[in-house]
Amino acid sequence: MKRTISIGFCLLLSASLMTTPSLHAKVMKMKLATVVVPHHAYNEGAREFARRIKEATGGAIDIRVFPGGQLGKGERELLEGMQMGAIDLAVTATGPVSGFSQSMMVLDLPFLFRDYPHVDAVLDGPVGRKLLDDLEKAKLKGLSFFENGFRNFTNSVRPLLKPEDFKGLKFRTMENPVHLASVRELGAQAVPMSWGEVYTSLQTKVIDGQENPVAIIHSYKLNEVQKYLSLTGHFYSPAPLTMGLRQFTSLKPEWQRLFITTAVEVTAYERKIIRDNEQKQVLDLKAWGMDVTNVDKAIFLKAMEPVYAKFIKQYPDWEPIVHRIRDTK
């Protein structure tokens, strides 16, 4: 009887050791950073990613999420931090990423994506994976594409219903050549600026406006410093979940696969949060006093069309990518 109990106990102990790290095993601690406020969808997705990784590894990997620019006020700092090994993972906009991988910048072309189903078909397919893989040249590992949504203009001067309304206004953009060129095509002055400076610059009238997805406009209560919101949807804003390449390759192969598959699964979770909240957030902004207008996107596309010719001339390898994206159903 004692022998039976002993064998049973040993089997139970062995099973528990397979799913729970040893008391003496070293837990691998990682940092995942963003620059956005804690309740933004980036961070909800990041926390879910961390939770699933911890659960799947039996607690052997513990990822802590640092929101709100705690590890770097600008997204470029986060990307550089991953290259240096000071930060393990980050969720950022593609704007700063384009400074590390020019192929990623193709996603920032104006009116490239028709709608959210088109986005999913492109970014979750071969085109998206190739763009993520290109980041390895910059010592970064692209895991998947979170999102921030389609970007829209806000300003404190007047409603923006047509391109001519932009003339003479100063707009903050990300440090991204495509964004800068696109805003200039509308006749506005484009001012590249890190996100941490934007609210104060709007408040003090250093700039007249900015452009961002509804989620950011809502999360940061830009209605307090901006009167007008034009739902232009001129750029789609993907947000790569990225890891330092050195940190990624230091993982054993099964954990590398786990990080990629978990990132892809959590991406659907994060995008759903953005999309489900968007309509309610627009209604909130109206209730908070913003003048919200829809626009004829076709006239904005026509005004920004020269941007395509300019950048395809500069980067000829973009042309087949643009065609593949536009042909994706």
Regions found by a protein language model. Name each.
Residues 1-9:
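Bacterial N-terminal signal peptides that target proteins for export
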Residues 24-118, 127-129, 135-329:
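N-terminal secretory/targeting leader peptides
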